[in-house]
């Protein structure tokens, strides 16, 4: 952004409430959290179809949205515990900009998915495009991919697509030119040491991939995209530094990407879930300091709904359902 001096002064004068950081007397401070003012680029009415893409925080948002008159295609996918121990649709998690973009482009027919990312072990096949899970037969791995494709068949017809950006540390298949959602098993490195590489993405890497995904969504007819940055931290870093610092870098890159995309595309807006949760410090997280407390998720999602679905009401009054966290969360993208 670049403004001439008079325009900058005009904007500052008109931004009376929000231009200064809030103290505890400010209406944006509520019970230990800071809730930025939202000026939504668009609003929607229920019933609506909302498609959620991204890290485990996207799954948390889904569980809160279930209590409203909102259709959630991703909640229709599940796998048995023999394939995945945690949330039934947790295998839909996408962590890095590469896999997120690949998934969107594949769903919209702009990219072909390769079966070479099914890695054979002594116990079966692992799908490196998924964030985890146990080995299955090749037939089941291919069947599961078709099931996921069917879910993503609802993408273009959704009223709102919410994309939660997770991290920028990624594994890459040099042979296929494909970003992976999990680290290949060490035997794969020994078998073909030049095939896989670790990449820490910067803005120059991540932004073009995400921009292609935004353009594909818009071209397919999606009118509303809401970008967020997951407040769930990176669990493990492969950069050789402290994960606390690596996480800050990761979120900073994604935050810049989200802002840039929202400023470029009229159909895209940014929602500050990352800023809200971060304002609460470690008190906003469970004891692992990774997963966000569900009551905090409810408050964040409520703030989002108030802005983008101003007339929406819960289906029934009462307590929200209990959440089962995806153990490992952002970490699962980095380790086997």
Write out the residue ranges for each language-model feature:
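Extracellular glycan-modifying ectodomains
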Residues: 1-336
């Amino acid at each position: 952004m670049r403004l001439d001096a008079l325009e900058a002064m005009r904007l500052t004068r008109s931004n009376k409430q929000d231009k200064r950081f809030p103290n505890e007397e400010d209406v944006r401070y509520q019970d230990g959290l800071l809730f930025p003012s939202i000026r939504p680029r668009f609003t929607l009415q229920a019933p609506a179809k909302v498609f959620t893409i991204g890290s485990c925080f996207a799954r948390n948002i889904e569980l809160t949205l279930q209590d409203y008159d909102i259709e959630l295609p991703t909640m229709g996918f599940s796998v048995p515990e023999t394939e995945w121990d945690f949330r039934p649709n947790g295998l839909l998690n996408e962590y890095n900009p590469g896999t997120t973009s690949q998934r969107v482009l594949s769903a919209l027919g702009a990219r072909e998915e390769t079966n070479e990312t099914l890695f054979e072990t002594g116990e079966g096949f692992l799908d490196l495009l998924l964030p985890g899970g146990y080995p299955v037969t090749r037939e089941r791995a291919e069947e599961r991919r078709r099931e996921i494709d069917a879910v993503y068949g609802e993408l273009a017809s959704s009223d709102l697509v919410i994309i939660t950006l997770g991290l920028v540390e990624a594994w890459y298949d040099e042979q296929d030119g494909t970003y992976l959602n999990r680290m290949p098993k060490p035997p794969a490195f020994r078998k073909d040491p030049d095939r896989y590489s670790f990449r820490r993405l910067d803005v120059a890497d991540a932004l073009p991939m995400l921009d292609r995904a935004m353009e594909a969504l818009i071209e397919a007819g999606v009118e509303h995209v809401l970008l967020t940055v997951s407040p769930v931290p990176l669990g493990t870093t492969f950069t050789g530094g402290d994960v606390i610092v690596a996480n800050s870098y990761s979120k900073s890159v994604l935050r810049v990407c989200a802002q840039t995309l929202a400023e470029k595309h009229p159909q895209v807006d940014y929602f500050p879930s990352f800023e809200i949760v971060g304002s609460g410090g470690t008190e906003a997280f469970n004891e692992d300091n990774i997963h966000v407390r569900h009551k905090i998720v409810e408050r964040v999602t409520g703030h989002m709904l108030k802005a983008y679905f101003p007339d929406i009401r819960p289906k029934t009054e009462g307590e929200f359902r209990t959440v089962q966290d995806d153990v490992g969360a952002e970490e699962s993208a980095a380790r086997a």
